[in-house]
Amino acid sequence: MFLIAVVVLAVLTVPLAGGRLGALVQVRLRRVWAIFVGLGLEVAAIDLPGLSEGVRAAMMVAAYPVLAVFLVANWRLPGMPVVALGGALNLLAIAVNGGVMPASPAALAGAGLEPAAPGFQNSAALDDPRLAFLGDVFHIPASWPLSNVFSIGDVLIALGVAWAIHGICGSRLVPSRARSELESRPGE
């Protein structure tokens, strides 16, 4: 939800920053299927009944290399290295914690979420988390819409996606060098 809110905000601010929203439909994204497969793996890991925790954890970790296929194929777009860094930090935190993103109990409480919800969770308070600072340590307060927890990796992914949207649209918020680099490779 955090990423969706950032994408909506980025799109809404493009015209305010002198960009053209029409440019979004002109960009040719490659390997879009990887987004659907990667996110599908994550959703299936959380929602499919009858899977062992080990299989669920493996599916969560496996989603990241699949999503990386999209990132590598679209590396020329502004912001993709930032998205990749955020994804790598999330993958690291998840991989060293058995397929679960560690969540700060304080962040979960602040977002109004259960620290120990039943069943497999993609983000949960763990007894002895590794690299806890890379986990979901930030929160949107429970009193706000879309309250949830998120990580520094999520922040970097959101910033990278916003940078990509503004860069593709020619916004003044993205340095002209990044825009001209994208424009020098039309149809790529």
Regions found by a protein language model. Give the residues of each.
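Transmembrane alpha-helical insertion/packing segments
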Residues: 1-62
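Membrane-interface capping segments at transmembrane-helix boundaries
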Residues: 20-22, 166-181
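Hydrophobic transmembrane-helix microenvironments that flank and shape a buried ionizable site
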Residues: 39, 57, 87, 133, ...
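Membrane-interface loop-to-helix entry segments
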Residues: 55-62, 147-159
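Interfacial segments of alpha-helical transmembrane regions
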Residues: 63-97
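A cytosolic-side transmembrane-helix exit/cap motif
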Residues: 78-83, 100-110, 177
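Extracytosolic (periplasmic/ER-lumenal) interhelical loops and adjacent juxtamembrane/interface segments
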Residues: 103-149
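Long, low-complexity, intrinsically disordered cytosolic termini of multi-pass membrane proteins
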Residues: 181-188
